[in-house]
Amino acid sequence: GPAREVIDVSGWVLQPGIIDSHVHLGSMWGSPYGPRMLAMNGVTTCLDMAGPLDDILEKTPQYGAGLNTAILQFASPPFTFKTNAPSKAEMVELIDKSLAEGALGVKLLGGHYPLTPEVSSTLIKTALERRAYVAWHAGTSAHGSNLEGMIEAVQMADGYPLHLAHINAYCRGAIKNEIDEARTAVELLNANPNIFSESYISPKNGTRLTCGPDGKIQSQVTGNCLRHFGFTEDRDGVRKALDMGAVYRAMGIKKAGR
């Protein structure tokens, strides 16, 4: 019989819902308003790439928009690990707890809060042993969030599945010129089909401005950005960058922002 409602889409383009494989819906790195923003732009399925898991689950009843959402819990000092060299037992505890509470897996935030190379390698293998999805913002205490960090991550994956986050983050000209870095990144991805990735189109770099008790910036990526624009990597540098408009503070709800 006839439909209850007919929507005339003459002249429009219809397509399936978009799958966004890298979003941030938690208060630490994104905003609880993220689900609504995604839905308004045609996204129906997404992968949150850091959590915090409990924060997103708590806010979903109020801020959710009916999206299919998978969440990776962040595996990172000084938050879910106390140091940058956690034991394997600590890794197993975090991974198992995250999976039991609803996470799809874990993500290493190496570019921001690096672990040692050895620990990073062990964490990836441990996550896979526990049948957890594992992603990595490339970077360790030996190599940062750049092309060298990406090369290191590909080598550490050693043929095993790994989601290497936002590939263009490693092609900003820190080691070679941007075109050569992008060419190398594409060659690495083509040569290593076990690695899957994505890229973003925003000209801005979203990161945290928080400082530790010593006044030093906590995120290595934020430090890189401050240094690039000639600011010190501390609370004073953040203030000056904000005053000069080199850094913008984007707020979600109270106590939420990046």
PLM region spans:
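Helix C-cap/helix->beta junction micro-motif
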Residues: 129-130, 160, 191-193
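Divalent-metal coordination cores built from histidine and acidic residues
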Residues: 9, 18, 31-113, 125-132, ...
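Acidic, His- and aromatic-enriched active-site or binding-groove loops in soluble protein domains
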Residues: 74, 135-139, 159-165
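Active-site neighborhoods of metal-dependent hydrolases
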Residues: 95, 99-108, 112-115, 167-258
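Histidine-rich, glycine-flanked metal-binding segment
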Residues: 1-15
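Distinct, well-ordered alpha-helical segments
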Residues: 58-60, 82-84, 117-125, 144-157
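Histidine-centered catalytic micro-motifs
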Residues: 17-28, 110, 134-141
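Acidic-and-aromatic substrate-binding clefts and catalytic sites of carbohydrate-active enzymes
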Residues: 27-30, 48-52, 113-116, 141-146, ...
